[in-house]
Structures are given as structure tokens and as C-alpha cells.
Amino acid sequence: MQQSQRLSQMLFVTLREDPVEAELPSHKLLLRGCFIRRLSPGIYTYLPLLWRVLQKISEIVRQEMNAIGGQECLLPQLQPAEIWRESGRWDVYTQAEGIMFALKDRQGREQSLGPTHEEVITLLARDLIRSYRQLPQTLYQIQTKFRDEIRPRFGLMRGREFIMKDAYSFHANEESLRQTYQDMYRAYSRILRRCGLEFRVVDADAGAIGGPSAASQEFMVLASAGEDEILYTPDGSYAANVEKAVSIPPPAAESPYTAFQVLDTPGTETIEKLAAFLKISSTLIVKNVLYQALYDNGLRVAVLLSIRGDQEVNEVKLANHLSRLAERYQASKLLKLALADAEIQNSWQGDPIPVGYIAPDLPDSCLGRQKNLAPQILRLADQTAALLQNFVTGGNQVGQHVVGANWGEQYPLPEVVDVRKAQAGDRCLLNPDQILETARGIEIGHIFQLGLKFSLPMRATFTDEQGSEQPLWMGCYGIGVSRLAQAAVEQSHDANGIIWPVAIAPYHVVVVVPNISDPEQMSVAEKLVQDLATAGIETLWDDRDERAGVKFKDADLIGIPYRITTGRSLKQGKVELTERASGQATEIPIEEVVTTLKERIEAALAVPD
């Protein structure tokens, strides 16, 4: 990597105002600092400064992958549809999540631009791995991925193309898979520590990659503007993405009702209004929420979920449960789960639904007779609702509720499920003495124990020691390289600009010449740049014909860790050394600049195991 660069010769144009397209501070700063430029929504050019950052991140990732036995390769970006159909994920990625770019070539064959490479790598393993003697194997690549995001936003956080490292491991048994999974866990932790980031590892939902039963963990870079909510215990014994988190809900209040009764409750279509009208706690109310599940055989299923009034539905957990019920409806997988809004309810063509006053026994007659609509409502009850006695719920008539209701008396108890959303303030399920706290995070890495999810449908097998054919055990491990770069900015910036961690900064030091017309300032700067480069210190030389104030503002904006200024102190044989992170400025002798910076940079790059 080039050790020094004159800023006057670089393609470098900064912006003084925040671009209107940007929402996050990190997105604004990357645009203003000439790190990226948008070509179209979700598609960005990586300019020279950011490209250096991405190269450094990639090299750290590469070193840590190689250290645990990973072998680098490069897989095709263009993938035939048939291998996705073989794994059973074509419909999920083109219809349900709809994030895959699908196209037809001139022969009419369906292709896709790879959002991920499980199918490609499994096909490769099926072709090349024959015997247990070849196992385990870990392959990885660093390349551009494509996802057709519905709403690309936040710069590199949610783009339509992005740089990612994805690794895949193959094993003879589950024990070997778990060992590599732990190796990856440690490698990912080292990557983020080496990149200078504060992070937390959390239990996570495996999504369409792993499926509802796969073990997985996410690596979250902590940032107040993070898209994901994390729940964790203060002692560090538990942390999970809110999509996966479990907890003990607060206890319900004691019911004042001892007998079943129908009450007129006009204008109480929300839990808040009903609780205020009856002067009761929302913990005594069973709310009933309608959803529609769409399976891959085209069947739509109305789902009525009963849950305690003070709780929210975790739709990821609900979708996972409905995925496990696919066989019940002669389907392979769930394509989509949606709240049954007015449009969906009208599409059912049944009796009117008393929205806001629905009871657990809402009649099936709200569903019309249709070919692709299940004739009966699937009824589920969250544990929080199932435990209530003498509760309040809808009366199946607009303006009416019932009080003093009980399961097994007025209403049959539906199938009981755990689909509530854990929240801050709940007690930890694993240690009830710990109260869950919340933080925001940016998902940077995700590791999965896939098990046999891909090897079974794609017939990827090996011959074991007894000569029997066995399916390969598999893991996959992703880390967003371009996403990590922006996450670092989101975590570390101030009002003046970016504060890059030393390990991934585009340059270690920027040498600023306040007045290029001063021969002494220029000659000292030139000598310093040469000496720093010789010492292996990456140096940006701001030799532009600009005012000193502009140069200082730009230096702060682009976030180079150290700034050397050849200014007034030259008369005393000194230059000014400013640390970007702290803003601390000191004057040091010119002859001590190289050794001082070398010591500081080496200290910053030293990461304990």
C-alpha cells in the first residue's frame, strides 16, 4: 500500500454542508469527506480514501481467517436458478424476502446475482469432497454481494451492493462443526478488536440463511443510531438481538372480576383506551391480533394470536413458529407473514371483522370460501395470555368487551406459543436476579451452525471411516467489510468529523503546511513525509494552496489519527502534533516526530488476545 500521498494530486473534494440524502452521521461524514459518492440508490463509488480503509479491513479479516485454517477463493457472482431451487431457497429470496436480483440470460435461463453463496459452495463440496480424510475444510472469499433492498438507505449500511467476507466450513460431524464455530467466534472477536471497535456478541435469529432451528450469533458494533436493539444483562452473562431474546415478563395485576360479563365499551378499540375506560391494568387484557401467513404452495392462512395487553408480538418468533407448521398445510416453507390490514381482510371475502373488539373465538365465517385460503383460522396463544384468569377481551361486537373470562370456560385454550417481544426492564430468563438493559447496535458479523440444512437437499455427502455415505455438516460465517467501515464512523465521530481507529484509518498521519509559500515550512514537511514513509508510517501531505483554516477543518473531517503542523514553532525547531481523538496538541522537536509517532501507532495496533 502506498506510504505517502500529496493531497494536491489526489481526487479530493470535501463538502461543507450535510447532503440531503443522508440521515446517519456516518453517512453524512463519508459523503462530506470524499470517501464515497452515490451512483444511484444503494450503489456507491468507493473513492481513494475509503478504498484504503476497505483494503485494511480486508487484510485484517484475511489474516484472521488464514490463522484458523481458512483458504481464500473466489466464487461466481452470477448463479443459476436451479441450484437455488435445489436448496429450496429460490422462492424465499425472489418472492418472500425478495432481496435477490433475478434475471434471464439471452437463452431464457434464469440467473441471479449472488446475495450469498451457500448453494454455490455446497455444490462445490459435493463435487470435490469424497472422504472423511478431506475434512474439515474451510473456504472463504472477500467480494461484492448484491441485494435488491426495497428501501436502500443509510449509505453503506443498507446498500444494493456491498463488500462482504463469507466463509463456509464442511465437517464429518457436529462436534467438528462446533469447534470451527468457536474458532470463528474468536477470529471475529479479534477482527473487531483489531479494527478498534466496541462490540457485543449476541444470540440471534438465523433467518433465511440458517432457518428457525440453526444456532447463530451476531457481532454488533455498538452505536446509538444502530438499526438493531440488543438486550443484555449488566453482568454480561446474556445478550441477544431483540428478535431472539427471551425474558420473564412482569407479573399481571390481580383481576377485580370474579364473574363473566359482557360490557358496552364504546370507543375503546385500543388497549390504552380500554384500560382507561375500565380503570384496569393492561396486564389483565387479552388482545387478539390477526395475521395472514402465505406459504410456498400459494395457501393463505389466517392466524389469530392472543397475547397479554401490555406485551408486543415478536413477529420473527411468530414467523419461525409458522414455518415449522408448513407441513400441516402441505407446504415446504413460509413465504410471508403480514398483519391482516383492511386490504387483506377484504380479500378474505367473509363476514365483517369487529376490528378492535376481536375475541379469541372469532368465527371462521370471517373467511370466505376461496381456493387458496385455509377455511379455518389458526389460533395461537402466547404464554402471557394463556396464564391469565378472569381476563378482559373483545366481545366480537363493535363497542363490546367481556370481563371475567377464562380459558376452558368461555374460550378453548389455543396452542400455546412463546412469541412475545422481550424488553428492557424484564427479568432475565437464565438468571432472574438480572434485569435486562437495552442498547443499539449495527450488525457487522453473523455466524451460523447450519448443520445439514443445505447438504441434505443438495445431496452433498462424503464416505465415513466405515465406508458409509453421510451428509456433510456445514457452517457459514459472514462479516460486512464495507458495512464495518461505516460502522466505525458511526461509533467514532464528533462535531468536527470522523475519528478513525488507527488500524483502519486511510493514513496514520496528515502533515499540514499552513503556508505553502513559506520555503521552510515546505522543506521541513517534505523531509518529514519522506522520513515517516521510510519508517512505515502512512502519511498524507496537505500541500494544497488553501487557507490554513480549510486544511485544519478538512483534516478533522477526514479523521486521520495524527496531524503534524509545520507552523510558527519551526523557529524553535519544533512542529505541532495533534491527536484527532482527544484534540490534544503538543509541540515536539522535529527529530522526535518519527519515533514518537511510531511508538504511538505501534501501541494502538497492539491488540491483546
From Swiss-Prot:
Kindly give the Pfam families that the UniProt entry links to this protein: HGTP_anticodon, tRNA-synt_2b, tRNA_edit
Q: InterPro entries annotated for this entry?
A: aa-tRNA-synt_IIb, aa-tRNA-synth_II, aa-tRNA-synth_II/BPL/LPL, Anticodon-bd, Anticodon-bd_dom_sf, Pro-tRNA-ligase_IIa, Pro-tRNA-synth_IIa_bac-type, Pro-tRNA-Synthase_IIa_type1
Q: What is its EC number?
A: 6.1.1.15
- Which compartments is it annotated to reside in? Cytoplasm
Gene Ontology MF: a single term: aminoacyl-tRNA deacylase activity
Q: List the disulfide bonds.
A: none
Give UniProt keywords alphabetically: Aminoacyl-tRNA synthetase, ATP-binding, Cytoplasm, Ligase, Nucleotide-binding, Protein biosynthesis
**Which family, according to UniProt?**
Belongs to the class-II aminoacyl-tRNA synthetase family. ProS type 1 subfamily.
What binding partners and quaternary form does the record give? Answer: Homodimer.
Free-text comment on this protein's domains from its UniProt entry:
Consists of three domains: the N-terminal catalytic domain, the editing domain and the C-terminal anticodon-binding domain.
- Protein name, entry field: Proline--tRNA ligase
